[in-house]
Amino acid sequence: MKKFLFMILILLSSCIMKAQIVFTPQWTPQAQFAGYYVAYDKGFYDEAGVKVDIQHPSVSYSAFNLLWEGSSDIITLQLVQAMIEIDRGMPLVNILQTSQQNGLMLVSRSDSLRTLDDFKGKKIGVWKVGSAELAYMMDVENEMNIKWVPFLQGMNLYISGAVDATLAMSFSEYLQIKVSGHEDKPYIRLSDTKYDFPEDGVYVTADFYQKNTEKVNAFVEASRKGWKWVHANPEEALDIVMKWAEKEQVHTNRLHQKWMLEEILRLQCEKGKDKPSFNLDARTVEKLSKLLMEHRRIHAPITLEKLKGGRP
């Protein structure tokens, strides 16, 4: 009996030693978050001594809301949104930067819309929530007078002809456009313009980081290891993504997720490079801060140092 109780105490001690973290990606399971699923399934988080619980947001309740209310410890978030929230008073800390190139596209429905000037005064589809701040600023700066038509998700507005063009992510909605029979339509990638700013990063609150520095750093290193493994083993990583999607009953298919994974891995690398750095560039942050201030999205400069919250 004493031996049995001793074994239970050992097991309990082992569980306590592993620090619990609740991690929430921006969306439901998909290849955009493959590195974290790999780190979980391959035991990289366990090896780092951190117990991670991956919880996905709902359509009506975002990852940021979960972080704000304390239900999540670590989330993914786009850089533009993170800087805006910091300016509003949310003390966010960037602990890992996965994206290096912008994935936003402006896709025309007509062969005649090819330059920014061509889109002036046109009706363009835009998400009701998120991802469009750079497009709005592009509209104002270039005096395009775009008539924005909101949609929740999917490309039905574009496919039905209700808009002249639409915003789309290169790793997601653009595939829907291509398979709907519009594969040869002109488009503009924001990554080919002055609005090419990185997107996905991983964030915690400053308070959580200060109180849990070691386990946050362990999470970061295990996540980096997961993403590096994905770059080296994309097909097996895709198997893991599909397993997570099935578990969460996400309606998708391997073709869509394969497209997404290939594009996400490309966007994780700087132009001309084939390996990710996982870091933010100080000059990029400075340029984005200046742009956001010019458009009154933020009211004071935000530096790389402030984004990193004292992290090396």
Regions found by a protein language model. Give the residues of each.
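Short, surface-exposed acidic
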Residues: 145-148, 184-187, 247-263, 299-306
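Pocket-lining segment of extracytoplasmic ligand-binding domains
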Residues: 80-81, 153-250
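Sec-dependent N-terminal signal peptides
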Residues: 4-14
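Helix N-cap/coil-helix junction residues
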Residues: 44, 50, 90, 182, ...
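N-terminal hydrophobic or amphipathic helices and topogenic motifs
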Residues: 15-49, 282-312
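Secondary-structure end/capping motifs
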Residues: 212-295
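Short, glycine-/small- and polar/acidic-enriched structural segments
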Residues: 20-151, 155-168, 196
